[in-house]
């Protein structure tokens, strides 16, 4: 994720229903424990998990994203309420800059240790983060690391988008999004059968009283998986399919995979 883009990510994601998404996740996360949030971005789900009494390790490749997440958590911790200081205390979370295909969790909240592998109760990976992996080989590494980082009978929940997203969003490979705070122009190009490039020009209004905008440019590459391949692959890597689901509120082209470690 581009450093500049991290600075305005929350403006860009302002209209996402985080609470609705979080409530969807909580259908499968029943008991308190430790959660790994892979590709945590600016920490919106971390805030909600901490509020509900979980311990959380947030992992992201963008240092700038993690800096924003840290500021959000600190703001919650310093709001003056004793309960908030406890829920959002530094002993309840850890933010780690790392690629999710390489990450091995060593954060042991219970024993206050950080020197050996510590398996989590749950792993979540939201907003089609797995589609930003380069190819199926990287997805295999991701699944293997998740298996290593997860307790037996623990749950891994991630979502992936299908080819349909490009028909859903782009008309003639262009998508225009105009909001009071910004205007964005998305351009889509298919690089190969499963690889797609998306270039985003984002214009953020500097002041609501004038027409001065600041321009940001972001280039993203998505790899699209065959859902049947995902199901077969994870079953061969120590997981069972607990459920698969879609939620029209988050787009028909998005599939949620809920896996249980054997």
Name what the model sees in each region.
Residues 237, 248, 252-262:
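Core SAM-dependent methyltransferase catalytic element
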Residues 44-103:
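Class I SAM-dependent methyltransferase SAM/SAH-binding core
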Residues 106-122:
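A short acidic, Gly/Pro-enriched loop at the edge of an enzyme's catalytic core
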Residues 1-30, 32-41, 44:
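Conserved class I S-adenosyl-L-methionine
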Residues 122-137:
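A short SAM/SAH-binding and catalytic strip from SAM-dependent methyltransferases
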Residues 137, 157-228:
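SAM-dependent methyltransferase
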Residues 140-152:
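A short glycine-rich, Lys/Arg-flanked "PGG" loop and its adjoining helix->strand segment in the class I
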């Amino acid at each position: 994720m581009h450093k500049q883009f991290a600075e305005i990510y929350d403006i860009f994601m302002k209209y996402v229903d985080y609470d609705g998404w979080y409530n969807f996740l909580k259908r499968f996360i029943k008991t308190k424990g430790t959660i790994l949030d892979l590709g945590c971005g600016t920490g919106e789900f971390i805030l909600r998990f901490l509020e509900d009494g979980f311990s959380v390790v947030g992992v992201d490749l963008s240092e700038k994203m993690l800096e924003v997440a840290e500021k959000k958590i600190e703001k919650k911790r310093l709001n003056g309420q004793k309960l908030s200081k406890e829920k959002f205390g530094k002993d309840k979370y850890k933010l780690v800059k790392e690629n999710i295909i390489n990450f091995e969790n060593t954060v042991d909240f219970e024993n206050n240790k950080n020197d050996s592998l510590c398996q989590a109760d749950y792993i979540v990976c939201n907003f089609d983060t797995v589609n930003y992996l380069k190819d199926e080989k990287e997805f295999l590494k991701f699944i293997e690391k998740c298996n290593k980082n997860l307790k037996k009978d623990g749950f891994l929940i991630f979502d992936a988008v299908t080819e349909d997203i490009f028909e859903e969003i782009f008309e003639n490979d262009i998508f225009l999004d105009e909001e009071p705070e910004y205007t964005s122009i998305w351009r889509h190009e298919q690089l190969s059968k499963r690889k797609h490039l998306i270039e985003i020009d984002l214009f953020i209004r500097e002041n609501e009283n004038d027409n001065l905008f600041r321009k940001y440019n972001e280039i993203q590459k998505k790899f699209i998986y065959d859902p049947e391949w995902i199901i077969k692959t994870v079953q061969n890597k120590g997981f069972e399919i607990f459920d698969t689901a879609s939620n029209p509120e988050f787009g028909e082209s998005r599939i949620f995979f809920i896996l249980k470690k054997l």
